[in-house]
Amino acid sequence: MLCTVLLALAVLLAVAVTGAVLFLNHTHTPGTAPPPVVSTGAAGANSALVTVERADSSRLSILIDPRCPDLADSFARLESAQASVLEALTEHQAQPRLVGDQEQELLDTLADQLPRLLTRASELQTECMGLRKGHGTLGQGLSALQSEQGRLIQLLSESQGHMAHLVNSVGDVLDALQRDRGLGRPRAKADLQRAPARGARPRGCATGSRPRDCLDVLLSGQQDDGIYSVFPTHYPAGFQVYCDMRTDGGGWTVFQRREDGSVNFFRGWDAYRDGFGRLTGEHWLGLKRIHALTTQTAYELHVDLEDFDNGTAYARYGSFGVGLFSVDPEEDGYPLTVADYSGTAGDSLLKHSGMRFTTKDRDSDHSENNCAAFYRGAWWYRNCHTSNLNGQYLRGAHTSYADGVEWSSWTGWQYSLKFSEMKIRPVREDR
C-alpha cells in the first residue's frame, strides 16, 4: 500500500517536473544554457521510468517500482532532478529582470549624462571659437607691434642722424672760436714755411728736376694714368703714387681709393701713418706722405664717388691739408684742414676740419667712445662723422648704422658706396 502511494506521488512529481521543463523549453532566455529535459514512460505493469537529459547531454534515469526496491536512492535522485529544474526555472525568471534592471539603470544614467555632455560640448565649442578669435586678435597685435618696432627703429636712426648734425654744429662753433683766438700764430708760421716752396715753384719742371707731385709729372709731359715716383720738398727720399691724368685736366695725386673690398681698412695707427694696399687698386697712401705733399704749397681736394647703381657724384674742396700747422704732425694726430666746398655729392667733410685722425688703437675724437672702433674705420672723426670713406665695404644698403663707406650728404648713413677716390692737386696760379 505504501509503495502504491509513493508511486502515485512520484508520477505526480514527474508530471510537475515535466511541465516546468516544458515551460522552460519554450521561454528560456537566449544566451543561457537550456534547462534539463525530463521525460516519463512506462517501464512495466506497475513501474514508471523518469529520464532527465541535462544540457551537457548526460542522462539521469529513475525507475519507480511499486515493490520499492532501492526507494531511498530513487527519491534522492528525483529530488536532485527537481532541484536542478527549480534552479533553472529560478534563473530563467530572475535573468530577464536582472537584465531589464541593468538596461533601465544604464538608460537612466545615459539620460542623466547626455544633457551634461551636450552642455560641455557646447562650452568647448564656445571656448574654441573664443580661442580662434583671440588668436586672430593676437596675430593682429603682433603685426602692429612689429610695425611699431620698425617705425621706432627708423625714428631712432633719424634721431641719431639729427643728433650727429646738432653735435657737429656745436663743435663747429666751438672750433671756430678756438681757431679765431689761438690759431693765428701757427697759421702764419705755416704760411711762412710754405712760402718759399710756393714762390719757387715753376709752372713746369725743368729738365732733370724731380717731380714733387703728379702735377709736376703731368707738366713734364707724362699724360697717362699710372704709378710715378714723386719727391716732395720735405720728403726727399721720395715715394711712389698713382697719378690721375684725366679728371678735370689731370695732375691729381691719389691718396685713397675704395673699389672692391679687397683690402682691409679697419687698421691701426701705424698702418694709417705709413700707408697700405696696392697703388693700382684699393690703398691708403699714408698720413706722413699726405702731410709731406700738402705742406709744399696750397692744395685742393677732389673726391669721386659711385654707388652700386652706377650713379656718380663728386665733391671739390678749394683748400686741403693734413698737419699744416703742426710742429710734430704725428704727435698732433695729423689734423685736417679743409674748406671751400663745391660739387654734386654735397658736403660731408667740412665738419671734420680741425679734427685729429683717429684709429681703433688711437682715439682723438670728441666722442665718449672710440668712433673708429664703433664705426669700423679710421678718419678725422668728431662726434662721430658725416663721412666715413675708410669704413667697411658693405656693398650698398645695409642695416647697420654709419659703418660702411659713407658720404652721408649723398647716400645717407646706411648705404656703403661702391667706389671712392680722394686725390689732391696744387692750386694752380692760372685758375
UniProtKB/Swiss-Prot annotation:
It is a single-pass type II membrane protein. It holds the Pfam family Fibrinogen_C. The keyword Acetylation does not apply. Glycans are attached at N310. It is found in: Membrane. Keywords: Calcium, Chitin-binding, Disulfide bond, Glycoprotein, Membrane, Metal-binding, Signal-anchor, Transmembrane, Transmembrane helix. The record marks Y375, H385, Y401, A402 as: Implicated in ligand binding. GO terms for molecular function: chitin binding; metal ion binding. Residues 1-3 are cytoplasmic. Ca(2+) binds at D363, D365. InterPro entries: Fibrinogen-like_C (IPR036056), Fibrinogen_a/b/g_C_1 (IPR014716), Fibrinogen_a/b/g_C_dom (IPR002181), Fibrinogen_C-term_domain (IPR050373), Fibrinogen_CS (IPR020837). Residues 25-431 are extracellular. Disulfide bonds join C214-C243, C371-C384. The chain crosses the membrane at residues 4-24. Its main location: membrane. Residues 205-428 form the Fibrinogen C-terminal domain. It comes from the Eukaryota. GO terms for cellular component: extracellular space; membrane. Homotetramer; disulfide-linked. Acetyl group-binding receptor which shows a high-affinity and calcium-dependent binding to acetylated structures such as chitin, some N-acetylated carbohydrates, and amino acids, but not to their non-acetylated counterparts. Can facilitate the endocytosis of acetylated components. This is Fibrinogen C domain-containing protein 1. The lineage of its organism: Eukaryota, Metazoa, Chordata, Craniata, Vertebrata. The gene is FIBCD1.
